[in-house]
Amino acid sequence: MALLQISEPGLSAAPHQRRLAAGIDLGTTNSLVATVRSGQAETLPDHEGRHLLPSVVHYQQQGHTVGYAARDNAAQDTANTISSVKRMMGRSLADIQARYPHLPYRFKASVNGLPMIDTAAGLLNPVRVSADILKALAARASESLSGELDGVVITVPAYFDDAQRQGTKDAARLAGLHVLRLLNEPTAAAIAYGLDSGKEGVIAVYDLGGGTFDISILRLSRGVFEVLATGGDSALGGDDFDHLLADYIREQAGIADRSDNRVQRELLDAAITAKIALSDADTVRVNVAGWQGEITREQFNDLISALVKRTLLACRRALKDAGVEPQDVLEVVMVGGSTRVPLVRERVGEFFGRTPLTAIDPDKVIAIGAAIQADILVGNKPDSEMLLLDVIPLSLGLETMGGLVEKVIPRNTTIPVARAQDFTTFKDSQTAMSIHVMQGERELVQDCRSLARFALRGIPPLPAGGAHIRVTFQVDADGLLSVTAMEKSTGVEASIQVKPSYGLTDGEIASMIKDSMSFAEQDVKARMLAEQKVEAARVLESLTGALTADAALLSAAERQCIDDAAAHLSAVAQGDDVDAIEQAIKNVDKQTQEFAARRMDQSVRRALKGHSVDEV
């Protein structure tokens, strides 16, 4: 009888049988696919040798085209040519229209308020459009590798929230791809540069792509990639450079009509061409809509200077979060096509005090890092010692009594991670508990972001504090959050997976972090006050129950003293004097000490009644 061949789950059964994996950089402006061949990561070109695939899809009744062919139709058929769809991922229609009022598409809202784009091929959502781009990349990889892909790693901006990440995974499934992992784009760059250069120490990954900006501060040490801090802007990128330059050309050409989509596209194409040319030339000639003129690099720099400054402010915040100074950073990795702009490289170099690294093509570095990670995850490198640690951008926690936020997982905690915390019931015979999941850095619920609510029912009716509920937060490698609440004595539990209907607003993460610093002292005082008020309410409720049950143990004078102390506590608890509330609580405790001792004696006597000493 032949022996069964056994291999570890996820690894190749045959020692020399490589599984086919790819890394995909699903970008706002351009996308790429890469793989590892003969030990080297490389991006895969199309039949014409082009490695970039424009993230553009042109829809017709008979079908659709993706990439360069689609982009060529943008000026003639704007409404059916969808570009920069990544910016729409995980957002509501209202959010998209508020952020990007000049988009030339015909939008309709679905029943849940999410966007649908009306095209010649019918109503399409951003997930479907993204899936068509992924299909084109997967087809390129399968043809190049002569086989079907066993799995892919897809990169996403560090700022993508749960809804945006889930939308990306849904798009991949729709494209028929097995997602090994979603990987933060800056982390993919760290993998690419970490393996190529072997640097150890703190590095900054400055990623300015077409639609998003991310800054990550990482520590590389002995094959370990640890993200110390992240920051950025989910709605800032090279596209914004293009639109600023297009508006400038419009003004110079005297074009007032913004309703002509064909002219809009011509202006944008002219701006993109000029931007690329100005990376090498000091002056470029522009010919658009019958107008001819010159644009200098100096004029272009003036237009984009404020946007570049915004990226450096985010860099400063990330460095502060990481607890390092610019001079502590050994290397600065430049990622994204927009980092080819000379002003960007110049300002970044000045900020960090060193020349940025551009050894790997900034357009390809993300895909290369994703390919390396995919090769490991698919099982081709089982002996790899590389460890990858991503982080969550904002703290996760729960609402507790008094409108306070109890942080369960602090921001910048590496993922995947699971943390648990025990809570007790507040009232006697409490049989249910509302779980309110929060995100943010402030101390009070009103200053943080609500992620989800659910209820745990079936808690045994015990005295206040008698039931113990364990709440577990689990963030997986893709940054998706699951929360489970379980009553420990019975095992009854409830859980929820957090999938917000749309993403964070522009700058929300940055402003939440900034506010937590600006209002730190105020928040601490507010928390202390809220905690004292909660304790006062607990003491008063407990005292009320005790008096109802055992008032006969007190004399009239003793009862009066306790009532006076309770009334005083109730009164001061309405105010904002933390010390006064604390002293009033201590006074109630002092006045009720003898009462508590008598109740304890009475309970002991009742417990011993009818039992002999030997039985005790």
From Swiss-Prot:
Family annotation (InterPro entries): ATPase_NBD, Heat_shock_70_CS, HscA_NBD, HSP70_C_sf, HSP70_peptide-bd_sf, Hsp_70_fam, ISC_FeS_clus_asmbl_HscA
GO biological process: iron-sulfur cluster assembly
Entry-linked SUPFAM superfamilies: Actin-like ATPase domain, Heat shock protein 70kD (HSP70), C-terminal subdomain, Heat shock protein 70kD (HSP70), peptide-binding domain
Any GO MF annotation of the entry: ATP hydrolysis activity
Keywords: ATP-binding, Chaperone, Nucleotide-binding
Stored Pfam families: HSP70
CDD domains, per the entry: ASKHA_NBD_HSP70_HscA
Gene3D superfamilies: 1.20.1270.10, 3.30.420.40, Actin, Chain A, domain 4, Substrate Binding Domain Of DNAk, Chain A, domain 1
Highest taxon listed in the record's lineage: Bacteria
Record has Transmembrane as a keyword: no
Function according to Swiss-Prot or TrEMBL: Chaperone involved in the maturation of iron-sulfur cluster-containing proteins. Has a low intrinsic ATPase activity which is markedly stimulated by HscB. Involved in the maturation of IscU.
Family, similarity comment: Belongs to the heat shock protein 70 family.
Protein name, per record: Chaperone protein HscA
Organism: Salmonella typhi
Lineage: Bacteria, Pseudomonadati, Pseudomonadota, Gammaproteobacteria, Enterobacterales
